[in-house]
Design a protein with these regions (language model features):
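A late-sequence structural motif
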Residues: 182-186
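Helix-adjacent hinge/juxtasegments
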Residues: 64-107
Length: 198
């Protein structure tokens, strides 16, 4: 059974691989405004670091703390090179991983948490739901990073869950991963299905 902790581990891995891929472009390309939600590669990655920090240290601990301003206004006077951005991402990942080890049980994930909507509405939910929100935020922004890389004719790292978690990058698939039944040869036709007669 896949948990939100597994999904957070997955987005950590994606975030790190996408960061390293984008970092090879050089600082100028890494910080160039590309017209996406957070403007540049740099700001997207730092935004995700602040988002995770807020979820893990505040919301998942049940503290209805308003969003820190840095979530939307990434400081320009800090993280002024690739090394500093990488360090920030690794610090946040280490902080998250430490908590995720403790939270990786159904009981811990079911504990009460909070999520602050529109800066002023604290919503009651479970720790699991708060982490699910953090996962979706990551996937949305990493999709932007993937699109920016494609626009620059840079092949992004694979985002396939199956490849990363089931096959562990092995291709063709090992025999142990293959389905034992027959492969369907016909694809169902699109269109409306007739209701069954009773």
């Amino acid at each position: 059974m896949v948990t939100t902790i597994d999904l957070m581990d997955f987005v950590h891995e994606l975030r790190e691989d996408f960061f390293e891929c984008a970092a090879t472009l050089g600082w100028r390309e890494f910080t160039k405004d590309r017209g996406v939600s957070m403007h540049s590669f740099r700001d997207v990655f730092l935004h995700l670091a602040y988002v995770e920090e807020q979820h893990v240290t505040e919301f998942c601990e049940g503290r209805p703390t308003p969003w820190m301003p840095e979530v939307m206004r990434i400081p320009k006077n800090r993280y002024v090179n690739v090394v500093e951005v990488r360090r920030r991402l690794r610090e946040v990942r280490a902080m998250g991983d430490g908590r995720f080890k403790k939270w990786n049980t159904p009981e811990e994930l079911a504990k009460p948490a909070v999520w602050v909507a529109s800066k002023k509405y604290p919503l009651r939910l479970t720790r699991d739901s708060a982490l699910a929100q953090c996962v979706t935020e990551h996937l949305l922004h990493l999709g932007e990073v993937e699109a920016m890389l494609w626009q620059l004719d840079v092949e992004p790292p694979t985002t396939f869950w199956i490849d990363r978690r089931v096959l562990h990058g092995k291709w063709p698939p090992p025999r142990s991963a293959l389905y034992g039944g027959p492969l369907r040869t016909a694809v169902p036709r699109a269109g409306r299905r007739r209701p069954r007669r009773r």
